[in-house]
A protein has these predicted regions:
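Soluble metallo-hydrolase cores and metallopeptidase-like ectodomains found primarily
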Residues: 55-57, 132-139, 145-171, 257-336, ...
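Noncatalytic luminal/extracellular "stalk/propeptide" segments of secretory-pathway proteins
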Residues: 26-56, 76, 80-213
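Metal-dependent peptidase/peptidase-like ectodomains
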Residues: 133-137, 151, 156, 161, ...
Length: 545
């Protein structure tokens, strides 16, 4: 273990960086950003039109979606007025009621479908302040399902978790946490972004910090999981709270998840800079004390629902086109790009379709799934409960990776559907399709709700968005707010989706169910077959968080 030497070396490294910076004043403005993906660099595929579309419905969908879009207005209402949508929470219920009311305004039938129960939790306010050796407000975010401080401030000295290697070591350390606030993860040695380190730091400094960070992270990796009852044991031993920090590669950006179920212990994510300060103060025995206030309410197991909107098919009501996007989120901020953008895309697409194409041939469904963040539970329950939809599915179109315009799609498990998707795109305006590249077949996947259809062998398509560095900047972070949405791209995606749905609904032929052979994915030597759907979790009894 190199904890104390780490911080001694860090001071030396910081001095080197400071001296280097002092020798280079006025280095100049930041480099001008360049649009790396305005258009793909390869030649446009044959499905990108060189002339205007001729289908009158396509033209009307374009006009309605691009000139009278409601996407930005809907997103602002959801994200600013309602906010995050934790599975089973009162705020999720409020957001789902908003969905029902808004669809009613559109003239669209929508309903809640219960698929199980989940432990419900209500968020209140939360604060933390350093009180010694100086006074400072701390940047904190109470984790979902956190315990509370019973309506009052609670104060304690700050200690660092012992990086124990056995239950016996943990038990020996446990009495020391009484009345304490426990730091339970490794800090970052620097909260500067990697781009700054690469541009400004000396190579020796960068290599040294990288090595020290790897060692420090390895020391504390998984320390709260080595004993399954870590949080409840720490609470029983009299700890005031647990602090953790999950830095996400940008200053001020942390990933925020949930605290373990039934721990009933106040748990906080702390900003990178403040967490590092607390860790250094504790390790250097400089007497840090913190007081916290956490308001929350555990409401027990409550019913959980998907919201399903529907336009009944006029001639093929037992065949379906599904618009798919999960509606639940974590609570670091508002859940904007994960996945309000996907939800609003599908909602706005259905509004456009209802306005322009109110009598589709096939039945159109929108699935606003709950429980995705806990394991595709809402969509998995829907496909298990509705075999008629799985059997009659023409296509499901799923969107769940951020705000950017759609730039990729593919046939999933069914290679013969690739030309079909290309044929659909050949009827759309090039303003939409010029950005899109059609991929080859892929596996079942597990990262989003299209997997809940694919695992049954049904044709489900992912609509892949331009990154905007989604994985680091907004995915599950405390900065996933309305301002991160690119409304022009949202408008673009909703219009594109409406056209896909219209063309899939009117397709004279059924989509292919011929599977790629072998199905990609899995362990070496593993043969994947369908159906291969796991059993969705319909309650929280086996869920850790």
């Amino acid at each position: 273990m190199r904890t104390f030497s780490v911080f001694a070396l860090l001071l030396a490294a910081s001095a080197s960086v400071s001296a280097s910076a002092a020798a280079q004043p006025g280095r100049g403005p930041a480099p001008v950003a360049k649009n790396m993906q305005a258009l793909p660099v390869d030649p446009a595929p044959s499905y990108v039109r060189k002339d205007a579309p001729t289908d009158p419905v396509i033209l009307k969908l374009w006009e309605e979606g691009m000139q009278r879009s409601q996407a930005g207005r809907l997103a602002q209402q959801l994200l600013d007025s309602i906010g995050p949508r934790l599975t089973g929470s009162p705020n999720m219920n409020r957001a789902q009621d908003w969905l029902l009311a808004t669809y009613k305004q559109f003239g669209v039938s929508a309903r809640k479908e219960q698929y199980g129960t989940w432990n419900s939790w209500k968020r209140g306010v939360a604060f933390a302040q350093l009180t010694a050796p100086r006074v400072k407000a701390l940047e904190v975010n109470m984790l979902s399902w956190s315990g509370n401080t019973a309506g009052k401030w609670a104060e304690g000295a700050v200690v660092v978790v012992k990086p124990y290697q056995s239950p016996e070591e943990f038990a020996a350390w446990l009495p020391s946490v009484k009345g304490k606030i426990v730091l339970a993860s490794a800090p970052r040695l620097t909260c500067r972004p990697a781009s700054q380190m690469a541009e400004f730091a000396m190579t020796s400094t960068q290599l040294s910090l990288d090595s020290l960070q790897r060692d420090l992270s390895a020391t504390y990796q998984g320390v709260t999981q080595r004993v399954p009852t870590f949080y409840s044991d720490v609470k029983a031993a009299g700890a005031v709270a647990v602090f953790e920090s999950n830095y996400s590669q940008y200053p001020g950006v942390n990933k925020i998840f949930g605290s373990p179920r039934n721990a009933a212990l106040p748990t906080f994510d702390v900003g990178c800079e403040d967490y590092g300060m607390l860790f250094r103060l504790a390790q250097n025995q400089q007497g840090p004390k913190v007081r916290v206030m956490a308001e929350s309410e555990a409401l027990g197991d409550q019913p959980v629902f998907n919201v399903i909107a529907e336009i009944k098919g006029a001639t093929k009501p037992d065949e379906y086109v599904v618009l798919s996007a999960h509606f639940d989120s974590w609570e670091g901020h508002s859940g904007a790009t994960d996945n309000a953008t996907g939800s609003i895309t599908m909602m706005e697409a259905l509004r456009i379709l209802k306005t322009v194409y109110p009598k589709p041939s096939r039945t159109i469904l929108v699935g606003h799934w709950s429980g995705e963040e806990q394991g595709l539970n809402g969509s998995g329950s829907f496909t298990a409960d509705h075999p008629e939809v799985v059997k009659g599915l023409q296509f499901a179109f799923n969107q769940d990776n951020g705000t950017g315009r759609v730039v990729s799609t593919g046939p999933g498990l069914h290679p013969e559907n690739g030309p079909r998707l290309a044929q659909y795109m050949s009827q759309m305006p090039s303003q939409l399709t010029q950005y899109i590249r059609l991929s080859g077949p892929s596996g079942i996947g597990a990262g989003s709700d299209d997997a809940s259809f694919r695992c049954w062998g049904a044709p489900a398509v992912g609509l892949g968005a331009l990154s905007w560095d989604y994985s680091n900047s907004t995915w599950h972070t405390n900065r996933d707010a309305f301002d991160k949405i690119i409304v022009d791209d949202l408008k673009h995606n909703a219009t594109l989706t409406a056209m896909f749905v219209y063309l899939a609904s009117e397709d004279a032929e059924k989509s292919s169910r011929v599977l790629v052979d072998p199905i990609p994915g899995g362990r070496p030597g593993q043969v994947i077959t369908v159906p291969s759907c796991g059993k969705p979790q319909r309650d929280a009894s086996q869920y850790r968080r």
